[in-house]
């Protein structure tokens, strides 16, 4: 179960998305602008953000940058009702995990959310795996020396 923040200035999105995403087993927070979204993001343990790209005052790309300043590991999915190659490229270059066009196909949204959360969980395990590698590298000389000593003792 993940905590997902949905940010959009469209009331329909803020009403539809939570009920659908809740059915998938996730908790949903909503915000109608970037400033409220940042407050929620800082107050709660948010695992993933779905945000509109065009919003008044703070657009989705500005919100993306601020979220990345706080937590570089948090996936952000960008929504737009005005698709263009340039906006998709800009969003991806800015660090968005994915880019979806409105009206959103909910099967596609579910898939993108699941893939982004899986990627985030894999990234969380990297420091542990690096530590495990170091532990193995450090322990190999110890076991070699111990093996040599035991071999000499058993002769």
Question: What are these language model-derived features?
Answer:
Residues 8, 52, 80:
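Active-site residues of response regulator receiver
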Residues 11-29:
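Two-component/phosphorelay signaling modules centered on CheY-like receiver
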